[in-house]
Amino acid sequence: MRLTIEVIKEKIVERKLFKRNRKSIEVKILAGLLYYLGLSLRKVSLFLSQFEDISHESVRIYYHKIKEVLNEPERKERNLIAIDEIKLKVGDKYIYAWSAIDVETKECLGVYISKTRNYLDTILFVKSILKFCSNKPKILVDGGKWYPWALRKLGLEFEKVKFGLRNCVESFFSVLKRRTKAFFNRFPNNSKFDTVISWIKSFMMFYNWVKSLT
């Protein structure tokens, strides 16, 4: 089923996602989408307040909550998956954001946030995306030393690729970096780790939804 705004609206009503329904559901969905697309919380609030009074805090809540009714990746046979990770700053510390993209469908199968970048992180992340695979796909990686041992441990075939087929995961991170550039690629000092995880998970779910519409 194509995930239209009407379908998302029905899911929100069915799940009783929001305790209060004083604002129209369509405006809540649009608020989350506009924030994902790059507008700040305040700009989304100012724009949508022409239709209904919405605070920037409400926009933040909608962005984090709507992911709960967006489609998770389907479990199916997958041939090639490209994985990679980047550094993001939270306050004065760095974290790693990992992503896995199906090379053929360009769908993001999962994101993972860690404070370290090692074999254990690789195993935990790859295990989390294998639930969307009915087979053992081939994994495309860069030269990161934390990949080979972990992937062999999981019994997965892998190949080191710098460009070409791995461009899809680079494209995902390009979109993510453009979005985080709005706050200088740095989450605020008071951002909790769980909040950052939720923010990036929401980003992934909106990313897949928007891609499914094109």
Swiss-Prot record:
Source superkingdom: Archaea
Pfam family, one: DDE_Tnp_IS240
Protein name: Uncharacterized protein MJ0017
